[in-house]
């Protein structure tokens, strides 16, 4: 049979719709790629302090040496570790990050090294640990100063012998590069008997110190621009600008929470901003007033229960630290693991 001839306009409309659909698909792919690129965490800055860190990291990357990244909370120690991994021969293998302070002591060993079925009560199936998941790649151990003595011994064996034993299992060879990080003074921890001296020297083959943001203020405008791009994309809004007066306020602030605190401030500004430029009013009071580091005053009546004093003190310190548990622990003079435990008790 012979179909009736199609009208010319019908053909034109069909072609146009197909073209528009392809254009929209291409635009959608482009936007997704742009968001993926913008939201990828990366080291931003060009200050001498940051360049020194990257110079050492670049030299260390091709080697197999263990690296210890030092620095205050929020300075980007994990980003330095990722930089080392991405510039090493292990770049195509996994990068596995572990926050040692966020894992309860009772399961930390099994979490790192894995366990066999029936190794302990509740071990209903075999589970591989973080070392196994990082095989061929890099294992980043953040808050290394929080390791328990028993786990310190097992980690030392990995670094010395290149092998470990899963809980309830046989010896396994470890093909993993270890990069560790801490905001503690590990030499002081060694002197106090809380950290093994032999493990410290095994970790401290190459030391890199991530500088606090207050020592690289010239990077703040670059970081602000970067985070504006990230959070404008995440919140599906047009690109915002930060005028000179806003940048001046941000540059003058002391940033006790470092880059992580700056990122949180910019995310907040993107959400609250009503125009196409961030204003000083979009910034938190503590940043506008420049009173970072001045502790809030808490008053308690005589006879206030100790647990109530502790609860209010921890919550106020967390508020001051903008939810950064590591920074709050530093301000309180306790370990990060302790603050996680205390928060669990308060809930």
Regions found by a protein language model. Give the residues of each.
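Conserved AAA+ ATPase core "coupling" helix
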Residues: 110, 191-233
